[in-house]
């Protein structure tokens, strides 16, 4: 596994997610009908939610796989390196080091990622960049949880996020509607806002 491949896969998934949102907006706004089937609000919402999950999982996968690449001593895309404090014999050994006594390593938890990075890399390598987007990362997790979970707590967390971001809680607002809203004071949607954050993070982490 090479960091360049990990990077390209992540960027490709981000691009795919964006294309899905663009396509569903085009179909929905033009009331597309095929063989009597209308491109409904439900279909539109499912596609947007699915696109966001694709984006989030692309970032999660990138964080884990890039971490393994750096543990194996690979340089960044720019050729720069940083010191590592471990020398795993292979990727499986590296993954076991990350997991420790746990069943898996949670690469959706910024605190865990940064702690591991500080344990394994000099000054945390490039993963300290996550500290600069800690708030955005948590917001994305709240949206992810609201899409994939049905708990009262995940719904409350999402509603709190909506209030914080737009100053009110529109009746019956769901994740897809929020993601398709224009960010106050900006010209892009919340989906594009989070996509840009992910792409920027991928680039920064890939280039020490």
Could you describe each region identified by the protein language model?
Residues 1-53, 57:
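Charged alpha-helical initiation segments
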Residues 3, 7-13, 87, 106, ...:
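Intrinsic-disorder-associated interaction segments
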Residues 16-19, 23, 112, 136, ...:
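Exposed alpha-helical structural elements
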Residues 18-21, 25, 59-63, 144, ...:
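A structural signal for well-ordered alpha-helices, especially hydrophobic packing surfaces
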Residues 26-29, 33, 67, 71, ...:
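Short, flexible helix-adjacent loops and helix caps
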Residues 33-34, 38, 42, 114-208:
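Charge-enriched, short contiguous segments at helix-coil
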Residues 41-47, 51-143:
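Helix-loop junctions and short alpha-helical segments
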């Amino acid at each position: 596994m090479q960091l360049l491949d990990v990077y390209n896969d992540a960027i490709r998934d981000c691009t795919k997610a964006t294309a899905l949102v663009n396509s569903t907006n085009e179909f929905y706004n033009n009331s597309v009908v095929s063989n009597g089937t209308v491109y409904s609000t439900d279909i539109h919402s499912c596609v947007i939610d699915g696109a966001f999950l694709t984006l989030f999982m692309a970032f999660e996968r990138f964080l884990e796989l890039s971490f393994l690449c750096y543990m194996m001593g690979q340089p960044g895309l720019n050729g720069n390196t940083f010191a590592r404090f471990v020398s795993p014999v292979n990727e499986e050994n590296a993954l076991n080091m990350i997991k420790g006594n746990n069943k898996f390593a949670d690469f959706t938890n910024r605190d865990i990622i940064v702690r591991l990075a500080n344990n394994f890399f000099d000054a945390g390598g490039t993963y300290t960049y996550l500290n600069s987007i800690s708030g955005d990362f948590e917001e994305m997790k709240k949206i992810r949880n609201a899409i994939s979970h049905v708990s009262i707590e995940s719904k409350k967390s999402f509603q709190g996020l909506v209030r914080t971001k737009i100053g009110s809680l529109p009746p019956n607002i769901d994740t897809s509607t929020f993601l398709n809203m224009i960010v106050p004071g900006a010209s892009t949607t919340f989906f594009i806002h989070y996509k840009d954050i992910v792409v920027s993070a991928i680039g920064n982490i890939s280039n020490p």
